[in-house]
Amino acid sequence: MQSGKILFAEQDGNYVLKFVGDVRLTLCSTLDHFLETMLDNQGFKAVIIDLTETDGIDSTSLGLIAKISVKMKQRHQLRPTIVSTNEDISRILLSMGFDKVFFLIQERATPQVPLSELSPMQESEQSVRQRVLDAHRVLMELNDSNRDSFRDLVRSLECD
């Protein structure tokens, strides 16, 4: 598995986020910062999240992706789109309830646009811990199964 990276493009308020390789906790600060900037953009219209080249993705990254849907609904009354052609990734998305808060497309449908890589950010351990905690809280809100799966992790992070 190649190490993960996140690519992006923006045109006229329409964003594409492409997750490549093995996307893990190490990219959570980078992703969360970009998402806040994107969603605060006055010209924001839509986002497509392309997981067609994603080999693996951890629960923190999934929680941050879920946060996109929550924030888009709150701020713009919109529902984002996820494109995934990897059966394993698609199965994870469905099991975690992403089909309830995203449009899921399981065929390659991402516009071919030039993409730039998000520069990795470094943050304190405490900041990363808070992002991990917030991401898992978002996942817990999606369904009862997630609530059961992440309850102990969230409690542990809250106690630290």
Placement of each model-derived feature along the sequence:
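Residues immediately C-terminal
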Residues: 56
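STAS-like cytosolic regulatory interaction modules
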Residues: 1-53, 70-160
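Histidine-anchored nucleotide/phosphate-binding helix
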Residues: 65-69
